[in-house]
A protein has these predicted regions:
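A metal-dependent hydrolase metal-coordination microenvironment
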Residues: 1-157, 161-177
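C-terminal functional module detector
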Residues: 1-17, 22, 72-75, 87-97, ...
């Protein structure tokens, strides 16, 4: 399934500026866009002019709307026409049972200090839709988006919003205060979770599950960390920017008698701006076309002096000497070949997929098509069928009640992507509140190659999987095709409010930056990680306290 989520702010405006038959294209400040994609302009030397054309387009257009020299109705009509094109494309290619397409867009607000507040907005159907999408032009405040969505829902138009790139929000995505900096109340919490039942945890601009500074006991927390605010090299504050901490903060809201605003499911996305998914480490092509189309431009391979001069002139990224060689530096080298959303649904239709998104029976992966699943119940048996797992308990995304003091029984499973590395381990991540304090614990629950979890450390033994950095080959015949376990929390306390989600890890493989270096015949850049462990995350299950 697929959703095209174009930016709502100035939707269609660049295309209209490049089309010389439009009234908009005759404005002086858009002339540089006219032939931008002519073959002679699609080369390395064009980068400075391209960067200038795009970086000046937005402020110049806003200025002309502000001073009255550009009628805002012209911009609005362009957006309406582009929105109609988006709807038409989704309708044309929707093929129930085979390929599902959703009408969607991206709400692209941010704080004044560049903290990212972007949301992907997905519509359930296409029969009745607004004339144009709600954008930052309408409100910088995401609460305005929720009000707009509530209004649509009252008129029979159903949609949900998915916060994404929270890692670049500078602590703003998952605050415990509202836009006016007042403590959140129940009405605010209900409105948020009603409109935002999902959160994106991985994409091309890094992974937002958790951060080493927030989860120092999780050895796998330092995974594809993109440390910057979006479109800058300003550091982003981790606290308030990552999903696991938000899940924990949601428990504290519930403990205080407020609706859990952060009782969300986990999904992934690509967020590339090139109309395609760059998901394979070996074949990574990044996100912004000419600016990061090869290893030199995205900082994984040393730059030749002439190329370094062009990059310096563009001003988009820096050039830095590292270990005696010049590399492009900025944010590109921290980006990722990620991610995907998986949905457990009865059929491949808009109705079934959207219902699964709403009930949070969804999962995220960092690129590979790993399938992960989680159930929780009070009376599961080892040989239960899938139907019995649903009948006796709940799937991921749901709440579990009524354990009568017993630890819930969790059934977790993961199936490898046959085109990717084998699975190394299956984990359960638990979060809970005790005595007003939030806590988290990572449990290995299933190990590859016959390994047994150490009951003291809750860790699998090393399965011996290694990577040869010289050619990116990996250890053969190590790892599992599938892992499945029935597990009970050895530290369960029936009085604690808790969540559990599953995480599956592949054997180590080369990161895209190492692949770039191998193909170029150079040593990998020394300050970048050489390998990674691709992974999948289930949505959580929330276990309610007995009291």
């Amino acid at each position: 399934f697929y959703a095209v989520t174009d930016h709502a702010m100035f939707l269609g405006a660049v295309k209209a500026a490049a089309d010389t038959t439009t009234e908009f294209s005759r404005l002086g400040h858009v002339q540089a866009l006219h032939n931008l994609n002519a073959p002679e302009n699609q080369n390395f030397d064009s980068i400075p002019d391209r960067v200038t054309a795009f970086s000046t387009f937005l402020p110049d257009t806003l200025a002309k709307v502000g001073d009255g020299s550009l009628d805002p109705d012209v911009v609005n009509q362009i957006a309406k026409d582009a929105w109609s094109d988006t709807i038409r494309a989704a309708e044309t290619f929707n093929d129930p049972g085979n390929f599902t397409t959703f009408v969607a867009y991206e709400f692209t607000s941010s704080t004044d200090d560049r903290g990212n507040l972007h949301r992907n907005v997905i519509f359930q159907g296409a029969d009745r839709l607004p004339a144009m999408p709600f954008s930052r032009f309408h409100s910088q405040n995401p609460e305005g988006l929720w009000d707009w969505m509530d209004g649509l829902r009252q008129n029979g138009i159903e949609a949900l919003a998915i916060p994404h790139n929270s890692n670049g929000s500078n602590g703003q995505m998952f605050k415990l205060v509202d836009w006016a900096s007042d403590p959140v109340d129940d009405a605010w919490a209900r409105k948020r979770i009603r409109n935002e039942p999902l959160v994106e945890v991985t994409q091309v601009k890094g992974t937002s599950e958790t951060h080493p500074l927030l989860s120092d006991a999780d050895e796998w927390a330092d995974f594809e960390i993109m440390p910057y605010r979006i479109a800058t090299t300003l550091e982003s504050e981790p606290k308030g920017s990552y999903a696991r901490e938000a899940l924990l903060d949601g428990l504290t809201l519930a403990e205080a008698g407020i609706t859990n605003a952060y009782q969300f499911g986990l999904v992934g996305a690509t967020d590339t701006h090139v109309g395609a998914s760059s998901l394979e480490e070996e074949n990574f092509f990044s996100k912004v076309g000419l600016l990061d189309a090869d290893g030199e431009r995205r900082g994984s391979v040393p730059m030749a002096p002439a190329e370094a001069e062009v990059i310096r002139a563009a001003g988009r990224v820096n050039v830095q000497e590292i270990a005696g060689r010049e590399y492009a530096t900025g944010a590109y080298e921290t980006w990722s070949a990620s991610g995907l959303t998986g949905v457990w649904a009865e059929e491949n239709t808009r109705e079934a997929l959207y219902a699964a998104l709403r009930r949070k029976e969804v999962f995220a992966t960092s690129g590979p098509r790993i399938k992960i699943r989680l159930f929780a119940g009070n009376d599961y048996a080892k040989d239960d069928s899938l139907a019995e797992r649903y009948a006796k308990g709940v799937p991921m995304g749901a709440e579990l009640h009524g354990a009568d003091g017993r630890a819930p029984i969790l059934v977790a499973s993961a199936l490898r992507d046959p085109s990717s590395a084998a699975l190394q381990r299956l984990q359960i991540i638990k979060g809970w509140v005790a005595d007003g304090e939030t806590n988290e614990q990572v449990y290995d629950v299933a190990c590859s190659d016959g390994g047994q979890v150490d009951p003291e450390t809750h860790r699998c033994p090393d399965n011996g999987a290694r990577v040869d950095i010289s050619d990116c080959s990996i250890t053969e015949n190590v790892g599992a095709s599938n892992l499945e376990v029935i597990w009970q929390d050895p530290d369960h306390n029936p009085e604690h409010r808790a969540f559990y989600y599953a995480r599956a890890l592949e054997n180590p493989t080369c990161r895209w930056s190492t692949w770039d270096a191998v193909k170029a015949g150079v040593e990998p850049r020394p300050d970048l990680k050489k390998t990674l462990q691709e992974r999948a995350w289930s949505s959580p299950i929330w276990v309610m306290p007995q009291s």
